[in-house]
Amino acid sequence: MTVPKPLKKAFTVGTAAVAAALLSLPIAVPAGAEPAPAPAVGSTQWIVVGVPAASATSGTLTAFQRVGQQWKTVLGPIKAMVGDVGVGEGADGVHRTPVGTFAFDQAFGREPNPGTAMPYFQATTADWWDQDAGSPTYNTHVQSAANPSSVTENLYDSGPVYDYAVNIAVNPQRIPGKVSGIFLHVTDGTPTWGCVAIGRSEMKSLLTWLDPSANPRITIGVGDPALLPAQS
């Protein structure tokens, strides 16, 4: 497993210290959004995205690796772009990044697999993400020579932002209309349609670091930082 080179000196804190720090932080949850819980027991990789206000379109991303009872910073904090109407409760057709703690499932990119252990496919013009709430393949990856439904995103034609990406499993139950196609991907320097976006080299490093056996999670919230790992 490759750990990305930290962009600044890494720090290590014990679980108790992190929990105490968490309680002292000015954490806010946007109206209509559920508080972001800690990752499931067994997670040893955690990505935290924090924004200064629910209406903010950028914030920071920090990646943590759990070693024993300690969390170590392995990347960040780095700049991260979020939805062009900020963060809060997600919904199809609303460019808002969902708040909460979520798993990662499917990685992909226009570029070859950079060495990630996550399930990965190299996107072509035949790769789509179905966002049609009335489709039987809603909120899934679809391979088709032609557009498979009325509301889709072509994962190749969308351009360099999808050179490297991973799906944030915000709506794994695929509840129609709840939210679909929320990814962590490469930034083009502008706010997103609801995804989280970071620099290309950092995105590539994160993919090589992510390991499904570590039960990786991402937490998105409001605060400075939004949340810190406080898992016992």
Model-identified regions with their sequence ranges:
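A conserved hydrophobic position in a structured secondary element of the catalytic/binding core
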Residues: 198
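Short cysteine clusters
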Residues: 195
